[in-house]
Amino acid sequence: MVRLLRTTGRYFIVFEVLVDWVLKIFRQKIFGGGAAFISPQELREVLEDLGGSFLKFGQLAAMRPDYFPEEYCRELLGLLDEVPPIRPELLNGIFLKEYGRFPEEVFQKFERTPLASASFGQVHEAWLKEGERVAVKVQRPFVAEDFASDARFFSFLGWLLRRTGIVRTVNPSQVVREFIHWTERELDYLKEAEHLERLLEQVLRNKFPVKIPKVFEDYSTRRVLVMEFVEGRTLKSYYLEKTPPPRAHKLFKDLIDFELYSYFFDGFFHADPHPANVLVSSSGSLGLIDAGIASEVLVSDRKKMARFVRAVSRDDLEETIKTFLEMVRTPLLGMLAEAKRDYPQHWMRIQFTKNLFMRKIKEELGSLVERWHKASREGGPMHDKSPMHKFMELFQLAERAGIRMPPAGVLYARTFLSIDVAVLELVPDFDIPRSLVEFFDKFDSEFIKLEQTPDEIPLYLRPDLEGEEAEILKMLDEELKTLDRELLTERVSGMMESLE
């Protein structure tokens, strides 16, 4: 009964705020005579009023300039995810449920006043019985239930974002699906503990100057995470003050190198370096916290992405096109196989899909590469030369052609866009393309080893696929390889002539 009343109350709050927003939009359209519109500041205020999951959604949006206009991303970075602390009796209830004891009985000392209190949880300072200082991350009561309720409104929010023209290039429902997927993963603190332990192992093995907190497994549960206390200010605090952190160039170089090495060579990386999750010590050293979003990367995906990133960072036109086509072959193959399976009598539909893809590539790829080369030759702001924005422009190109990029590629771009946004704001003279080239040169021998690592079994050789289905996939794969060679030859020769 309590849960039902809470859910109903949450519905009324969300409904009231969203209705006010919709009415304002349509008043602007009817009486203002123009397009429906909501300013970046108004959107931030709406999300802050809604709180909870909507604040998390805004934080995701702030890191996606490929989805949202830049002025909205910058405004949403300032979202105030600050809420009153969990009431003492509720905090006691959480500990009694998780441990069967009060906080003061679990720890030698437990600071009741949290260091930070956000919509999904809060962090306390404490000391273990053994005397070690720790950070205790406690999930707020009813977070999972509230998120399940809020998720029902996100499709409506997606409609509003499309109606106001804020979301661009993609269907807002795609943004919503991505948000729900990652947020559900963040709600399990034991999963985050596994991520932190694996990242710490990678840091120690590779001797990177990055601090990852040690997890205390015996104290941690699905709703309470106990980890080593890491000193420092968040990168977000510097962002809001618009002042660079100490030793900013080295800090960002260390962060980029760590994320690249983790992705390409370890095959597991911290996929959410949001400014609120990056700690900076007084000496300028780097710490990473909140590893709720981390991901594995297949060897085959790492190889393709490595070739692609190297080509883009070095302005290698021919290799950029070639590696881009390699990356989209797998999702395109899946689309074509699905069409062939569902509509075997309509092979023309499959041919149409392939031709649509070719036409979109031909129409747009040349102008993109020419603009990149112009920015590179003429100097200009770092924003125009950012490899991260090049990646997203290519991904958007594939999206407009009806091709979903591989999840590993999208997650890579999302991760480095988070870094890119902070770098361009705090250290605008930081040369990201040069940093990438230096990384590839430094670890050239590692890339040779990666190229020599066997790929996973091709889709059409999977043991659970037999007969006609396997034959269709194999045939389509061969056809796409032919398509790639034809398109590459035709497009490169045409663009090279236009650039000369």
Predicted regions and their residues:
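Glycine-rich ATP phosphate-binding loop
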Residues: E125, E132-R140
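Conserved beta3 strand of the Hanks-type protein kinase catalytic N-lobe
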Residues: A126-W127, P273
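Hydrophobic residue at the +6 position relative to the catalytic HRD Asp in the kinase catalytic loop
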Residues: A276-V280
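A short beta-turn/loop motif at secondary-structure boundaries
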Residues: P114-A118, F216-S220, V410-L411
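ATP-dependent phospho-/nucleotidyl transfer catalytic cores
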Residues: E70, L76-P84, L96-K97, R101, ...
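N-terminal accessory/targeting segments that precede structured cores
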Residues: M1-Q122, E145-Q174, D431, I448-E456
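Helix-rich C-lobe and terminal helical cap/extension of kinase-like folds
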Residues: L5, F37, T221, G232-T234, ...
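Short hinge/gating elements
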Residues: A35, S39-L43, R64, E75-D81, ...
